[in-house]
Amino acid sequence: MENQFEHFVGFQWDQGNIDKNLVRHDVENWGSEQVFFNRPLLVLNDTKHSIPEKRWVAFGKTDADRLLTVIFTKRGDLIRVISARDVNRKERKFYNEEG
């Protein structure tokens, strides 16, 4: 899968999301960001949740090899993380087969 998000310049954190992933899923913001720098990184269009803005789902690993699902949108050259959590069983299988 081609990664169209390799040329972003940084991340944008919404005040409402800054601590949400840590509280709900025990995922630090820096862990969410690491997913985009490590390979393999699988990115799919999230057509089910792309209204009103286009969203994507990324499957990738942190530097500590924690496999995460990251829901995000793109704002210019920035990635805005909406949600990050551990992958579920189905997502882990997909990542292992496609990555």
Positions of the model-derived regions?
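Ribonuclease/tRNase effector modules and their secretory precursors
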Residues: 1-99
